[in-house]
Amino acid sequence: PNEPLRVNVLFKHVQKMLTGDSAVIAETGDSWFNCQKLKLPEGCGYEFQMQYGSIGWSVGALLGYPQGANHKRVIAFIGDGSFQVTAQDVSTILRCEQNSIIFLINNGGYTIEVEIHDGPYNVIKNWNYTGFVDAIHNGLGKCWTSKVKSEEDLTAAIETALGEKDCLCFIEVIAHKDDTSKELLEWGSRVSAANSRPPNPQ
């Protein structure tokens, strides 16, 4: 009991959350590969972008999606590095009183960038992410945050988010920095090899 939470266990529980009234937003990074394994119920929305590899896009997308489809409860999966790029949009999400669920996967760095080309620039300052959202909330309106470190924590947080909270639910998932999907490892090595090619003479 209370063993460290693995990302594949997170997505096992996420699968059970999905209904035709849900929508999934997958941030650039390992969330791409984990969300692609989900089996979407009929009617469940799904948004991701891979063409440009733009990190941080999902927070703005999470703001926009419910504005156009307010019958869906949107569930977003965002890495800590990506979140730091566009985190301020949470303020507008709160002002618009949206009831989305954010799973913030805190593994202490830009995992996708590490797999492509490692270096000290991929180390980020760790935030207290739940504290950050609580500060933006500032006691005005409705918001609920939780920090989870084990499967037991996770199941309790999901039960609360789905059962009691018709507001923004922000669940910070503490994950090990090396807890990475094999798909990301394979993809990162291919991109790294492509980036290492000599220039094509014109």
Swiss-Prot record:
Binds 1 metal ion per subunit. The lineage of its organism: Eukaryota, Viridiplantae, Streptophyta, Embryophyta, Tracheophyta. Keywords: Decarboxylase, Lyase, Magnesium, Metal-binding, Stress response, Thiamine pyrophosphate. It comes from Zea mays (Maize). One of its GO terms (molecular function) is thiamine pyrophosphate binding. The gene is PDC3. Belongs to the TPP enzyme family. SUPFAM superfamilies: Thiamin diphosphate-binding fold (THDP-binding) (SSF52518). Mg(2+) binds at residues 80, 107, 109. Homotetramer. It catalyses: a 2-oxocarboxylate + H(+) = an aldehyde + CO2. It holds the Pfam family TPP_enzyme_C. Its EC number is 4.1.1.1. Substrate binds at residue 113. Residues 30-112 are annotated as: Thiamine pyrophosphate binding. This is Pyruvate decarboxylase 3. PANTHER family: PYRUVATE DECARBOXYLASE (PTHR43452), PYRUVATE DECARBOXYLASE 2 (PTHR43452:SF39). Induction: By hypoxic stress. InterPro entries: PDC/IPDC-like (IPR012110), THDP-binding (IPR029061), TPP_enzyme_TPP-bd (IPR011766), TPP_PDC_IPDC (IPR047214). Its cofactor is a metal cation; thiamine diphosphate.
